[in-house]
Amino acid sequence: MTRLVTDPFRAQRGMALVEAAIALPLVLLVLIPVGEITRLFVQYSTLAHHTRSAVRYVAERAISDTTGKPVITSALTTAAQNIVVYGAPMGGGEPVIDGLTIAEVSPPVITAGGNVQLSVTHPYRSLLQLGGRLPGLGFAADLTLEDLPMTVAYTMRPL
């Protein structure tokens, strides 16, 4: 005997896969830029944290004699640059941010007001292989992330 009643779920088979195939590119279009911008903020925060730590390190040790005038020695300069790049005054190991080098860290200087200043400029390198661009898709201009310079500068009074 032939079956006259059909299974109502039989017609729905495969629909979830088709819907997922349609929705996945749209979801990725939203999530990938969010992830990339989050990565940018994390790297900037890490760079700012280590720069601030280096300035504090120099500010605590810059007063070397009884005159009260700050003096930055070459050992202090090297230690400050190592703190920014490696996270420790002695240096060594992996950089805290991929691609960060000592050359990108300016030596700490004494400003006209007697404060210690340190600045770092490091280009952000995108993980996206889209030429470093996040497409605006007609809603906004394309956002260029390739070699976006992250510049951090801190000034502290010697303690």
State what each model feature region is:
Residues 16, 20-36:
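Alpha-helical hydrophobic helix detector
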Residues 12-15, 43:
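Glutamine-centric residue-chemistry signal
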Residues 36-48:
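Membrane-proximal amphipathic alpha-helices
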Residues 1-13:
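N-terminal leader/signal peptides at the extreme start of proteins
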Residues 13, 20, 37, 50-53:
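Residues within well-formed alpha-helices
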